[in-house]
Curated annotation (Swiss-Prot):
The keyword ATP-binding does not apply. The lineage of its organism: Bacteria, Pseudomonadati, Pseudomonadota, Betaproteobacteria, Burkholderiales. It comes from the Bacteria. This is Ribosome maturation factor RimP. Belongs to the RimP family. It comes from Polynucleobacter asymbioticus (strain DSM 18221 / CIP 109841 / QLW-P1DMWA-1) (Polynucleobacter necessarius subsp. asymbioticus). Keywords: Cytoplasm, Ribosome biogenesis. SUPFAM superfamilies: YhbC-like, C-terminal domain, YhbC-like, N-terminal domain. Required for maturation of 30S ribosomal subunits. It is found in: Cytoplasm. GO terms for cellular component: cytosol. HAMAP family: RimP (MF_01077). One of its GO terms (biological process) is ribosomal small subunit assembly. The keyword Cytoplasm applies.
Length: 163
């Protein structure tokens, strides 16, 4: 948690927002960033700028790493915070629960956003419309504490835009 706060503060000073931090084998520290306005995409130059800053800041803060990787969230970006679940309302996601609900942990459906409670409160409930085993549309109601991981389902159009 301390690492996340320090890295988030460094990114904020550079004008970026932290999406997630992952630690992998071999000392890899993967930091995923985005622009706070969500309009401008992350470029290689953005990743280079952040990498340069963090390669100096992390040793000063005694945050261990052997290799540092900076990246954008990508097409299948993780959906982590309450604000993300609200922001991506209406989008298709793959959602995995920590504990099975109705004999299922994995769901693919459309986010319904905040259903009840305050956005950043622990009792906030979000919704997901998905196709049930019988083919009928069902709704899953969940809190962030129940979610193991969620990612956007990439939408790729190989035919190009239609006018």
């Amino acid at each position: 948690m301390r690492d996340q706060q320090i890295i988030a503060a460094e990114l904020e000073n550079l004008g970026y927002t932290l999406v997630e931090i992952e630690r992998e084998a071999g000392g890899l520290l993967r930091v995923t960033i985005e622009n706070p306005d969500y309009e401008r995409l992350i470029s290689v130059l953005d990743c280079e700028k952040v990498s340069h800053q963090l390669s100096y800041a992390l040793p000063v803060e005694n945050i261990p790493y052997e290799r540092l990787e900076i990246s954008s969230p990508g097409l299948d970006r993780p959906v982590k915070s309450a604000a993300d679940f609200e922001r991506f309302t209406g989008m298709e996601v793959d959602l995995k629960l920590r504990v099975a609900a109705g004999n299922r942990k994995n769901f693919r459906g459309v986010l319904q956003g905040l259903l009840s409670g305050e956005l950043n409160s622990p009792d906030a409930k979000f919704g997901l419309l998905f196709e049930g085993a019988d083919g009928a549309e069902s709704q899953l109601e969940f809190s962030l504490a129940e979610v193991d991981k969620t990612r956007l389902v990439p939408v790729i159009d190989f035919k190009g835009r239609k006018s």
